[in-house]
Amino acid sequence: MLLYSISKAAEKTSISSYTLRYYEKIGLLPPPKRKNSGRRFYTETDIQFMLFLKSLKETGMSLEDINEFVKDGCILEKINSDVKSAQLSPSINKRIEILTKHLEKMEIKKRELEEVISTTKGKLDTYYSILKEEVENK
């Protein structure tokens, strides 16, 4: 099994070691395994989980919502380990609620960005027209 130090995990995930320690402190990451020296080490599964957290964070999801989203662990693993879906319903419903709310926020941001992009393109067109007229008038 391949093990990663915190610096290697940070490098592999592009998440700073400071942020990894912070995520551990607030309970977003489970406490890592430690060597006899007390140094943290992470497995490939830990790395994949860090990347998942990063992807949620990159969409603008708050740490509070991410923490709520992941607190019950991996639902797919639980389904694969024969946990009854009825037992998972509360977790699934909570995740649906979080994702729905987050999707609504992202849709609003998308519309705002589309407006900014449109305005920026309009400005560029104006500036290109000015330069074109300047060249044609010489």
From Swiss-Prot:
Which Pfam family, any one of them, does this sequence belong to? MerR_1
GO biological-process terms attached to the record: regulation of DNA-templated transcription
Signal peptide as annotated in the record: none
Which ranges carry the HTH merR-type domain?
3-72
One MF term in the entry's GO annotations: DNA binding
| PANTHER family in alphabetical order | REDOX-CYCLING DRUG-SENSING TRANSCRIPTIONAL ACTIVATOR SOXR, TRANSCRIPTIONAL REGULATOR, MERR FAMILY
User: What's the protein called, per UniProt?
Assistant: Uncharacterized HTH-type transcriptional regulator YyaN
- Can you name the source organism? Bacillus subtilis (strain 168)
